[in-house]
Amino acid sequence: MKESVIRKLEGLLERNEEVLALLSDASIISDQDRFRALSKEYAQLEDVVKGFKAYQQAVADLETAKEMLEEDDPELKEMAQEEIKSAKASLERLEAELQILLLPKDPNDEANAFVEIRAGAGGDEAAIFAGDLFRMYSRYAETQRWQVEIMSANEGEHGGYKEVIARFSGERVYGKLKFESGGHRVQRVPETESQGRVHTSACTVAVLHEVPEAEAVEINPSELRIDTFRASGAGGQHVNKTDSAIRITHLPTGTVVECQDERSQHKNKARAMSVLVARLQAAEDEKRRSAEATTRRNLVGSGDRSERIRTYNFPQGRVSDHRINLTLYRLNEVMEGDLNALIEPIVQEHQADLLAALADEQG
C-alpha cells in the first residue's frame, strides 16, 4: 500500500481514539448536539479503523512468518510458507476494502429521499406500471425498515398513478435509491389486450435527497406563485369541498409542485415546499456534477425520460440494467421488492469508477 495512504489511515486511527476519549468526557455528554455529532463521526470511522487494524495485524503476521523461514526445522519452514501465502492474500483483500472505504463519501447518502414516479408513453398501461414501481419501492423499503409517506398522488383512471411523489425515510435511503433515477421501460401484455400482443410503456423515476432546513437553498417568496384548488381523486372527481390542495410555481425555473394528499392546506403547503427545495437542490447538484465529471460517466441518473436505465420484460421474466449490461431472470422477485441484486452491482460499478478516477488524479 502507498505510504501516503498508510499515513492517512494512521491519522484516522488517531482521530478515532480522540473521538472515543471525547465521548466519555462529561462536558461533551451534557452537550447533546456535540455528543450527537461526535457519535456520528465515531460510527463513520468504525469500518475503516477496523479494516486498518486487521491490515496492521496481517503485516505483523507476514513479518513473523518471514522470520520463521530462517528456522532449520523443515516443518516450521513449510508452516511459514503457508502463513506467508495466507497473510499476502489477507493484505491484498484488506487493501482493496480500505481503498473503497477511503473513497470520497457523498454527504447526501445518509439523507432521506423523495421518490417521484411519472407515467410516460403508454397511457393507462404506463400509469399501472407506475403503480407497480411504487409498490416495488415500498416493498423494498419494508425490507430496509424505512418509512414511506405519500406526499402527492395523481391516480390513473384504470389503476396505478399518473404521478406519485413519496418521502422515504430511514437509514441511508438516498445512498441506496439514488441510482434508480431515469427511464424505466416495461414490456408486457396488458390485461385489456385480447390478441396477446406485448406492449411497451415507460415511466420516469427521479430520486431527490431531502434537504435539511439549515442547508436549504434560499428561495425568495416573491419568486413563488401559490395557487389553491380543490383536491381531486381518480377520474377527476373532487374528493373534498375545501380548496386544500396547493400548487407552488417557482417562477425563475418554472418548477411546479402540487400537493393535495392532506386535508389541511397548511400541511400541503409545507410538503410542497419540501419537495420544491429538493428539486431545486437536485438541479444545482446536477449542474455541479456536469461541471466536475465531463470526462467521467455518471451512474446517478437525472430522472430524464430519454435516459433509459432499465427494462422489465414480463413474458421473459427478465429485468435488464442498461448502464452496466446486467440481466437477471428474476423479475417476480424484483417486483416484490428484492432490489439488492440490482442495487449492489451498480454501487460496485460506481465505486470502481471512483477508484479509476482517483488513480488518474494520483498519476
From Swiss-Prot:
Name recorded for this polypeptide: Peptide chain release factor 1
Family named by the database record: Belongs to the prokaryotic/mitochondrial release factor family.
Modified residues (N5-methylglutamine): Q237
NCBIfam families named among the record's database cross-references: prfA, PRK00591.1
MF terms in GO: translation release factor activity, codon specific
Record-linked SMART domains: PCRF
HAMAP family according to UniProt: Rel_fac_1
Primary role: Peptide chain release factor 1 directs the termination of translation in response to the peptide chain termination codons UAG and UAA.
Localization per record: Cytoplasm
InterPro entries: PCRF (IPR005139), Pep_chain_release_fac_I (IPR000352), Pep_chain_release_fac_I_sf (IPR045853), Prokaryotic/Mito_RF (IPR050057), RF-1 (IPR004373)
Cysteines engaged in disulfide bonds, as pairs: none
Keywords of the record: Cytoplasm, Methylation, Protein biosynthesis
PTM annotation: Methylated by PrmC. Methylation increases the termination efficiency of RF1.
Disordered, as annotated region: 286-305
One CC-aspect GO term: cytoplasm
Ranges annotated as biased composition (Basic and acidic residues): 286-295
